Each structure stands twice: as C-alpha cells, then as structure tokens.
Amino acid sequence: MKNKKWKRFQVLVGDCYDNLATLSENSDCWQQAFELLKEIILEERKTKPGVASELEKLEDETDYAYDISGWLEDCLDEMDMREEYEILLKMCEDLLTLFGWPEYTGSDLKMRKVFALLSLGRNQEAFSYFEKWLKKEPENIAAATAGIYACIATKDFEKGQELIDYFILNPNKCGNENDIIFTAASKFYEATGNKKAKKQIDKALKAYDEYLEKYFSEMDDLEFDDEDKFDIDEDDLPFD
C-alpha cells in the first residue's frame, strides 16, 4: 500500500501517544486516526477489492510499518478508560464490519462490544448479541464469559448458571485458559447471593493468582542470576 495518507496516519498516531503521555482529556486525535485508517482501507479497496480482507493481512500489506494492531488495541483501551462507550461501540462495530473474522477470531472485539452495550444500559441488546455469537462459536469461552455478564445485567440467572456449569468443569482449578470465566462466575455468584459457590470460585482464583506471583518472581530471580553470570570483571578473564 502506497497511499500518501499513511504519513498523516503516522503523525496522528504519534499525537495519540503524546496525548497519553500528557494525560490530555481531548481524545480527538484517536478518533481522527481511526477514521483516517478506515478511509485509507476503503480507498484502497476501490481499486483492489480484496485488499486487507483481514487485519493480519493489512499488517502484512503495509510491511508491519505502523503496528496497526497494537495501536488499535491502545485506541480501544483508551476509549474504554475514558468511558466513551458510544465511540467504543462504534469502533468495535466498524472493525467487525471492515475486516473478515473467521470463526473463533475477533473475540476481544466482540467482548468489548458486549461490555460497551452493557455500560450503555443496552442490556437486552448485549444479551441478544452474545447469544448469536455463542450459537456460531459454541465452544468459545470468551463468548460465554461475555454472556455471564449479560445474564447478570438481565437477571437471567438460569442461563448464566448453564454457562458456568458447561464451561467450568472443575470449580477448583483455575488457569490461564479459563481465568476470565472464573472472574465472571465470581461476579455472577455475588449477584445471585450464592456465597458457597462464590467462596469456592474465589479460592481457585486466589490460588491461580498466587501461582502467577510465584512464577513471575522466580522468572525475575532467574533473569537477575543470568545478568550476574555475564557481569565479569576484566581482571577475572583468563587471558588478555
């Protein structure tokens, strides 16, 4: 892609990170960069209809020069942090429409959409979206997690419990692949007043947190030891 507007996009991206560094309350540069990115892609597709059909292909076709995926994640995070939920919802919908998302991909975007809808009080809409998503991807734990939050908001506790029972096979074993749904289950049991089930889930979450803390502490120690190994004084060398 040799669209001259990429230079303008790059400048706007720089403005976005300056915006972060200075804690500016103005989010215009993020929205401007997002809209310009859409504009560039749609312009390219006028002459090359199949260009950038997926986000990963866009990165490849721009030689990974702009870290578009990384910037988009930061952009969505920023809208979320600023509680700009209408803008966040629109961005998620635009990205889900702009690119192709094969099954079991785009889960982060779809979860963000559900949470944006819930934050806007559009609970039934969030519930309906999660149901359609889970129907297409019945083993997607991200869809189920989003669904549990939607069930809490709509007070559909029967459906929420069904999701927990199906996706949490062992309530005592929380790990990297299912910690998000354990967190959702904890919120669910808090909402339903099931103290016994919440205590069991929270115990598993705590055990996993302690495991992670120990793991990263040991990794830090190993890195420190490795640095010491290579910190050799010149006088200790066997020869000049």
Mark where each language-model region is:
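N-terminal alpha-helical scaffold/docking segments in eukaryotic complex subunits
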Residues: 1-46
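TPR-repeat structural position
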Residues: 23-30, 85, 123, 157, ...
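Acidic, Ser/Thr- and Gly/Pro-rich intrinsically disordered linkers and low-complexity segments
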Residues: 42-65
